[in-house]
Amino acid sequence: MDRFRIQDGKYVVEKEIGKGSFATVYRGHVTTDPKSHIAVKAVARSKLKNKKLLENLEIEIAILKKIKHPHIVGLIDCERTTTDFYLVMDYCALGDLTFLIKKRKELENNHPLLQTVFNKYPPPSKEHNGLNRAFVVCYLQQLASALKFLRSKNLVHRDIKPQNLLLATPLTNYRDSKTFHELGYVGIYNLPILKIADFGFARFLPSTSLAETLCGSPLYMAPEILNYQKYNAKADLWSVGTVLFEMCCGVPPFTASNHLELFKKIKRAHDEINFPEVCEVEDGLKELICSLLTFDPAKRIGFEEFFNNKIVTEDLSHYEVDENTELESKSKDLQESNMFVSEFLIKKRNQKGVSSRKDTEFIPKSKQEPMLDQAYKDETEMETGVKYGVNIAPEVYQNEMIDPEKLAAKLIAAKQLGSDEKLTNKNISHLLSSNSSRVNKLDKSNLSGKSDSSLDRDYVVVEKKAVEVNSLADDLAQANVGNNDEAVKDQNIKTLEQPHIQVHQPHNDIQNLQRAPSTTSGGTSSRRASLVERRLSISSLNPSNALSRALGLASTRIFGSSAQTNKNQTSNSTSPNYTQPLLNSQIFYDLTENLILHTETLNQPALINVDHAKGINEVIRILESLSAKAFVVYSYAEVKYAQIIPLPQAVIRASPALQFEKRLSDDSNPVIDEDSDEELDVQKNLSNTLLSETVNTRYRLRNDSSRNSYNKRNSFNKERFSFSSQGSNNSKRTNSYSSTLLPAEIISISKEAIVLYMKALQILAQSMKITSKWWYSCQEKICSLRLNILVQWIREKFNECLDKTDFLRMKLEEYENSKPGTHNQSPKSKISNDSNEDNVAEKVYLEKLLYDRALEISKYAANLELQGQNLHICELAYATSLWMLTISLENSPYTDQGEDEYDEFLKDTNDVLDSEDKIIIGKYIKSISHRLKMLRQKMAKY
């Protein structure tokens, strides 16, 4: 990019050296002194879309302004403009500590200065990435010096890790050891100087105070934070222990596929730290590491004891006896060249004949291995920390592209075969993993760091709600259902008066859970017993794609292709507490359908305060109502998601379950084919009309007065998005969405999907909060199988929504950051850039989305009812409409004391309905309820 100036021309900003989701870091220099190098962190205000991001940046600025220390990256200047924040900071040309550990061998060969440093202080072994003792003790003392200063200011950093420990060039503003120490530095004067960076998570925390915010990087996070307990400044000491261990051994002391597993692994270690046999670590360092990595913070070494440790206070002057004229010369050369550490690697590789193409250049480990547990990477993370070495600028290198279809097929195959092979494609993980905690375990035996969990990439805000949801679901999954005779008998897994699912006695033989013969239940809600036994796929309800994507695709993706298959396979869940009945896809099919049909639970009190005294039946009743609401919103979000991210053909070919799903979408399901041609035509018409109508968001129904032009718009949509089942056109349908949509349409659909997913998350989180209050007030810690199944379903949907929301957020950023005119436009639908911008800027209202969708579904259900066909589909459609309209009337349902993060996200969508709107919606609810009642009376006669 071209150079530019900031602070009225005081600083010249040069080449980009790092980039993240929220910030870009450039190198530069003082205008009047080109040899005075700086780093400039630029944060666009448009990227700080919520107050948490802005707050973290302001905290970082405030803290850096107050602290000045030689081993802390200093804030030189700061400028706020109407569009950006510019933080002028110390320039650290040698990147961060991860370069020395994970790229040591390449640096030995390619970097002139570091080559000399490593020759003087050679690594202890070629079998691991551990550093020479001189590095270890020097950086330990420098880190201790910085922490001691922070403690004097009552500051806790909360994100100590190698990526936040930057390395500055030595021998630049001094020439000898004496001057080095006079300037306030500690350690060895001829080694790169360590500086703590990134105070986005730091807080002023007096020694007597406790904090409870979850933040930091999982692999370096103290167990009390992982377990979302209150913590104090000693959490930083745990992180120091992990960094010290990694400097000695080349790998973190604990690795896991997700935060919960990491906590369990730390707890199971019982304070016994295992050092690899190939690493020779002196006893003093081992003792210090073990004292730092103590599980109980009360028993963990204190700051005073740490600062007075014999290694921390060791005299290192014996490392400084030799003159280092060569080191000084190369340091001066590096300073004059103003080159960043990664550029030397690229340069040397190109000189050796390696292709200079971006997709074959040097890729740091942090880019090679995407995060495994993306479900917990919340958008509130302060990703301004492209800390001059964590993320290298895209013009310096670019990741090698991987065929997503091949990786997706590999993911399906690995799941079916029970493979332990780790898959590392971030986008496929987002697209296909509905429970991101279900990731294969890491290979701990590899000491080179190549198989380390990429949880150490950048830094992560641990989504506290996700941790709580998964932890509670694990607790209930391991509950001894068999001992609760009365609960099981009382519930008898009767899914809302559903006699076709039963538990065979004795109760300890839960693995025999299976379907009973088909029966019909009496009363006004009578219907055929099961969707499977009706010879009709649940995915026939395409108005919201509700039961096709949500149950047909998501459930089979999570649980396997059938209940029988699940019986013969081991659960792929990370949690060892899962039992097969809880992961039975058929139970989830029936559970969700019946929850929607059980419209008697539509209206619940606005504030729920449950406890064990109210009994398990009350809890189940509340959860069923909330689950139904979450599911209908989730289902509509899935429609939006499918328009942007169609499934790759390789995924469908690799999975029998998804092949079945594809036949459903192609209207060639052999089960449906058994029905009459007339019934099939009705279903096809319902599917084509409704799904095609939702694809083009520019032509949605906007108000009642716009319905006169409905047929014209619908015709346009059908012309553009043909869903006919003829020949090859049908087979290509699933891949036609995103390639046909304009960028403005993709942005609009993404925003709508995010709002819907966030609403589903809000309801699901509230469900788990209610369950948590009841569960932890229980003395017996026993629950019914019915409640257990509900909780596991809520957990699965919560994790899936979290993954997809994060993916859509990144997709949205990608399109919003694209320059106008870079995307091809359809000749049939070219519109001006101004029109595009107006369309994108249109505000998304959850209530309107649900209102319009509910009316669409009920309208087509009424048409089907008039034809006297598919009454079971009509029943499900009417019930879905009622749930959607009810949700649109709610203002943060089931609220409790304290504001939830999802409530905060959706607060702009609350209170958008005036009294007249609510009256209209109430009339529709009354009308549709009457239709549903009449329909059920009609069905009861059959």
From Swiss-Prot:
Specify the taxonomic lineage.
Answer: Eukaryota, Fungi, Dikarya, Ascomycota, Saccharomycotina
Q: Which residues form the Protein kinase domain?
A: 11-312
The free-text function statement in the UniProt record for this protein reads:
Serine/threonine protein kinase involved in the cytoplasm to vacuole transport (Cvt) and found to be essential in autophagy, where it is required for the formation of autophagosomes. Involved in the clearance of protein aggregates which cannot be efficiently cleared by the proteasome. Required for selective autophagic degradation of the nucleus (nucleophagy) as well as for mitophagy which contributes to regulate mitochondrial quantity and quality by eliminating the mitochondria to a basal level to fulfill cellular energy requirements and preventing excess ROS production.
| Cellular component, GO annotation | autophagosome; cytosol; phagophore assembly site membrane
In short, the EC number is 2.7.11.1
Q: What is catalyzed by this enzyme? A: L-seryl-[protein] + ATP = O-phospho-L-seryl-[protein] + ADP + H(+); L-threonyl-[protein] + ATP = O-phospho-L-threonyl-[protein] + ADP + H(+)
Q: Which PANTHER family match?
A: NON-SPECIFIC SERINE_THREONINE PROTEIN KINASE, SERINE/THREONINE-PROTEIN KINASE UNC-51-RELATED
Q: Give the protein's recorded name.
A: Serine/threonine-protein kinase ATG1
Give me the ranges of the annotated region Disordered: 435-454, 505-529, 817-836
* GO BP terms in the entry: autophagosome assembly; autophagy of mitochondrion; piecemeal microautophagy of the nucleus; protein transport; regulation of autophagy; response to starvation; reticulophagy
Enzymatic class: transferase
Gene Ontology molecular-function annotations:
ATP binding; protein serine kinase activity; protein serine/threonine kinase activity
Q: How does it assemble?
A: Homodimer. Forms a ternary complex with ATG13 and ATG17.
Q: Where is the composition biased (Polar residues)?
A: 435-452, 819-834
| Origin species | Candida glabrata (strain ATCC 2001 / BCRC 20586 / JCM 3761 / NBRC 0622 / NRRL Y-65 / CBS 138)
